[in-house]
Amino acid sequence: KKCWKKGLLYKGFDVVPWCWRCGTAISQHEILTEDYKEVSHKSVIIKYPVDGRNNTWLLVWTTTPWTLPGNVAVAVDPEKKYVEAKKAGENEVYYLIEEAASKLKLQIIKSFKGKELLGLTYKSPFDDLPAVKKALSGYAHEVIANDPFILPISETEGTGLVHIAPGQGAEDHQLGKKLKIPTIDLIDEAAVYFENLGEFSGENAKENPEIIFNYLNLANVIFDLPQYLHRYPTCWRC
């Protein structure tokens, strides 16, 4: 009652960990205390074409490729050092964090702070899917600033440009609510893609990850598909 009177309670939406196999939510406490397994997943570094800049791309890394149709924005750290870089002998220009350029053996053209990327808009290969188009409702994919308290950006892992899907990730959802950007719903309780998502509709996102890679390959937007070894929470009920 006191919390209500102080205006501390509200009705809204949130993201919770969910086991698609047994159809149950998993509490944060269970994730913190129950089993983790070391697993290897195929991640993806996707190329997003920057609007108004010929042959210029954002390099964005994600360990959850199934969420890419839900991409709404890309986050950068305004104060960290980013670069414009390219592969030797090639014309494509990429934006990414400085440390990642060295790891990917790219030639650095120039460096600058992340804030110079803010406001750039880009296209996603999933934009023509009916459900995506409806959810975005004219919103242009944009480079946004991270919130270090919600989503800190690493200089040692990934590309420094973070895929933001407010309908799928907890930190993404928090940042999306703060910035009032759209949410794209992708899957049901059994991890099956909803209707109006083109060839993905009816497919299980967790059992058939290759459908995303095949789609990206046809769109010619894959920069790399690195294997990623990490500790991953598992459902104790399964």
What name fits each language-model region?
Residues 70-72, 76, 80-188:
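Catalytic alpha/beta core of large soluble enzyme barrels
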Residues 1-69, 132, 154-238:
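Residue patterns forming the tRNA-binding/recognition surfaces of aminoacyl-tRNA synthetases
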